[in-house]
């Protein structure tokens, strides 16, 4: 058990697994704001402490352009079409058509995934997850943005230093031991409420490919990312992470590793961890973040934390949103 500055006590992941019935392995009912999820780990004191991460006053936008991934890895999402129009010579206005809210840098909301075995987060009925309803929508994080200490683990840099660069074309799984080793090489210590950013180098690698090779990579359904394991899920919860974000397609690797322990409980996702994080723990995931410039700056300064803000679009009931994330070092 660990407690926050508000006095709220949270069990270990092992204890979560020992909860009864549908509650086993979930954080359902543990947070004061039922729809906020693990960003609840960020307390006012955490935000004040995060302000101490501002040392150089350098600001980084962590979102790629809305049309950056065209083509991208998604079989469905396309780049939006931007139209500018005028009512008279002194006026300009604009709109977007075909805007997929998770088509570029994004944050996955808690209604983005339903656990095959127990349903949506907090037992929210399936019928409540539709347009025009608020339950589990990203508007919760728009009305009270996620602001806290962001820590960047440069797995890409660590692997290069070891002489074993990540094989993005093969969709290399990145295991917990590797992520821990990279964090230890940076002398990183995690705190409750941290926003974890994992720099893999995947986005910059993918965006540098010719269009035809991007399409081939999309069709291969391979993307490097975190290896699926019960150990990683436990580690994320026990470190009280508020958000996990990465500069790759799905945070976790695709396809899921054959040994994924979630193949039986997440058959529709072929053993991905998305259901564990979103539907069971209430832990939002950030995907396709622009972390390269921030990582290079942090390496140059030797400081691997920053004040990070995440302000999704205020769309009631959205399943996800552009992350609208900023880091200040």
Q: Model-found features: residue ranges?
A:
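Active-/binding-site microenvironments in catalytic and ligand-binding cores
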Residues: 2-329
């Amino acid at each position: 058990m660990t407690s926050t500055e508000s006095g709220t006590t949270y069990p270990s992941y092992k204890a979560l697994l020992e909860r009864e019935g549908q509650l086993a392995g979930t954080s359902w009912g543990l947070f004061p704001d039922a729809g906020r999820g693990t960003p609840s780990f960020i307390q006012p004191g955490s935000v004040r402490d995060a302000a101490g991460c501002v040392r150089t006053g350098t600001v980084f936008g962590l979102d790629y352009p809305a049309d950056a991934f065209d083509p991208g890895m998604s079989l469905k999402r396309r780049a939006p079409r931007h139209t500018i129009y005028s009512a008279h010579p002194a006026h300009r206005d604009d709109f977007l058509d075909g805007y997929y809210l998770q088509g570029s840098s994004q944050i996955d909301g808690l209604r983005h995934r339903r656990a095959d075995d127990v349903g949506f987060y907090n037992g929210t009925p399936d019928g409540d997850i539709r347009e025009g309803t608020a339950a589990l929508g990203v508007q919760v994080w728009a009305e009270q943005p996620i602001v806290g200490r962001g820590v960047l683990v440069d797995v890409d840099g660590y692997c290069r230093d070891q002489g074993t660069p990540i094989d993005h074309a093969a969709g290399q799984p990145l295991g917990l031991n590797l992520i821990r080793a990279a964090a230890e090489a940076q002398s990183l210590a995690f705190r409750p409420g941290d926003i974890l950013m994992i720099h893999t180098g995947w986005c910059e690698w993918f965006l540098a490919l010719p269009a035809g090779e991007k399409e081939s990579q999309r069709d291969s359904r391979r993307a490097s990312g975190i290896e699926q394991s019960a150990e990683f899920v436990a580690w994320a919860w026990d470190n009280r992470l508020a958000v996990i974000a990465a500069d790759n397609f799905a945070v976790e690797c695709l396809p899921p590793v054959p040994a994924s322990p979630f193949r039986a409980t997440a058959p529709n996702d072929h053993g991905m961890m998305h259901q564990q994080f979103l539907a069971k723990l209430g832990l939002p995931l950030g995907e396709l973040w622009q972390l390269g410039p921030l990582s290079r700056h942090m390496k140059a300064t030797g400081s691997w934390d920053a004040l990070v803000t995440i302000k999704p679009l205020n769309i009631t009931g959205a399943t996800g949103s552009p992350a609208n994330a900023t880091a200040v070092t």
